[in-house]
Amino acid sequence: MNAMLNIKEGEFTSTIYTLIHEHKFNDAIRILQYQHERNPKNLAALSLLAYCYYYTQDFMNAADCYSQLSYNFPQYSQYKLYHAQSLYNAFRPADALAVVSMIQDENLLNESVKLEAAIKYQEDDLVNCRILVEQLPENDAAVIINTACIDYKEGNYEEALKKFNEATEFSGYQSGLAYSIALCHYRRGDYDSALKLISEIINRGVKDHPEFNIGMVTEGIDVNFIQNTQKLHESALIEAFNLKFAIYYRTKDFKAAKESLTDMPPRNEHDADPITLHNLAISNANSDFGDSSAKLQFLLGINPFPQETFANLLFLYCKNDYFGLAADVLAENPSHTFYCLNEYQFNLLEALIYMPTNPEESLKKLEKLEKECLDRLRKTAIEIQIKKEQKTTDSDDSLEMRNLIESYDDSLEMYLPVLMTYAKYYWDKRDYQAVEKLFRNSVDYCKEHDTWKLNVAHTIFMQEKKYKDAAAFYEPIVHKKYDDGILEVPAMILANLVVCYIMTNQTDEAELILKAVENEEEAALMMKPNEKFFHNSIISLVIGSLYCSKGNFEFGISRVVKALEPPEKKLGVDTWYYAKRCIVAAIELMAKNLLVMRDSVVMEVIQFLTSCEVPGRNIYTVPDDLFEQAGESKVKCNVTYEARMIKAALLMVFND
């Protein structure tokens, strides 16, 4: 065995301890597993194997090893405690409690009570958890921390904050404690204090653990993934970055939120903890529905998962019009429905899901929700006004005012989905005047909100003759990012604004936007040469579509074709969708003898469709993750297949 593993005789023990000291746990585990297979009752090998599993957060394998140790060596009571701790960390509270109850050693009494309290805490049995904690010595920092955790879970954040600070004074700086204090500040709405503590945790991590490669992924540096280890856990870095993400996501600084995730120590996706996986899913929900929904679905299958997962998955399905899937998930998970959704979320989801089949009932639910949301908004607005009139400079009052404003913003965020669901009902009926009336009635509460402005702009835009008014709503959204970050503005917003300018003869303003997008795409392409950028293409496609809709197909289609040059760089699901719409519309009119196009334009289109065949093989025109039924259907749902079919139809009409 030693020869096979290249370990010299007499150096086995020193080799194992060296590997552990150098944090090469996988190598140590491989050797110890082999040794354990040869001699299952070797105490040293099995205890070291258990330690390595525990240190690398593989708690189920650690529990299995400690179970064998406690059975084969009952004289060592600590193995039962370690067995229970492993089960607790593997989220097996009932099994952990059963093992704890078998520990008889008086020397382990305090540790056993602490673990039993932690198990009760994990099960949300806070009453018995507090009873157990109160049995422990008061001068123990762990007891102060445990009491603080109970206060936190009960929602008493002020008291929890005091106790965490007391524990820090008692035991000195610890990253885990600093994170707990930051979390209390976050719950209190004091984001500045939370971010200050998070920065300290991260700075210490950068200084003390350069091997964690903090921030290097954001800078585009290729680095090795790191493992989940006890050292990483003790640094509280993952928790700190996730809290930083939560703060920026809540304050709608989505760019900084994404950077929080890429800054954290890089790990393989299968090593990511549930919180990180959840945050990755929601951060990419708008750009990659398939990946986000897959992550959220996966999280629902593990225990525990972040409570927000269930609601976020359901709302993601509804946002993308997969109401049947949302209904199935809701029906298949009644326990999740009870524990993970509040009354507002449940009622809104029901209204969304049943709107296509039972609009009358859905509208009744929306009407009730709207009344509740507006009542809450009015009440909070009055409280804010009263507070403003008092004009105190006390810091506690300042925090209270901030919390009131945040409460108002939260109420507004609850009202907007209700309003938009209402609006969508009329939008789908193309009753844009009814939609505009709805938005006009909500102007007092929503006029400063970008989502409201954007949807008002879309509604006015669709009424065609109000392009100047639509531009007035689009402009503030675009101008925020005009000089730096215009690519962060969705391409359709830019395209609609350009169309507004064209239709109101403001060609100079339209050219300025096109030039700004072109310049930023060129700069971005230099930074990321292998990435595709579609903003300029989509804007040009929309302009081309506009000319086609006005009957000028030759100019419109030429603009569309040029927008996708070269196809290997510009072809994507969205760009192909707009391009094929114009071409198919032209073919239909040609087939009806209502349109004649010059031969040169037709040949240009044929050449374009041919050039799309190779890069279009892996670009699917329908979601390819959830709904693929068979290999044959998948073959027919890519750009290559559609380009060939359209080319065949065009040639048939052209040669007729």
Curated annotation (Swiss-Prot):
TPR repeats lie at residues 9-42, 43-76, 141-174, 176-208, 238-271, 378-412, 416-449, 451-484, 537-570. Keywords: Cell projection, Cilium, Cilium biogenesis/degradation, Repeat, TPR repeat. It holds the Pfam family TPR_19. Its main location: other. Coiled coil: none annotated. One of its GO terms (biological process) is protein localization to plasma membrane. Expressed in most amphid, both phasmid and several labial-quadrant neurons. The keyword Repeat applies. Disruption phenotype: Sensory neurons are unable to take up a fluorescent dye from the media, a phenotype that is often associated with aberrant sensory cilia. It is found in: Cell projection, Cilium. Gene3D superfamilies: Tetratricopeptide repeat domain. One of its GO terms (molecular function) is intraciliary transport particle B binding. One of its GO terms (cellular component) is axonemal microtubule. Belongs to the TTC30/dfy-1/fleer family. Plays a role in anterograde intraflagellar transport (IFT), the process by which cilia precursors are transported from the base of the cilium to the site of their incorporation at the tip. Specifically required for the kinesin osm-3 to dock onto and move the IFT particles which contain these precursors. Component of the intraflagellar transport (IFT) complex B required for transport of proteins in the motile cilium. May be required for ciliary entrance and transport of specific ciliary cargo proteins such as che-3 which are related to motility. Component of the IFT complex B composed of at least che-2, che-13, dyf-1, dyf-3, dyf-6, dyf-11, dyf-13, ift-20, ift-74, ift-81, ifta-2, osm-1, osm-5 and osm-6. This is Tetratricopeptide repeat protein 30 homolog. It comes from Caenorhabditis elegans.
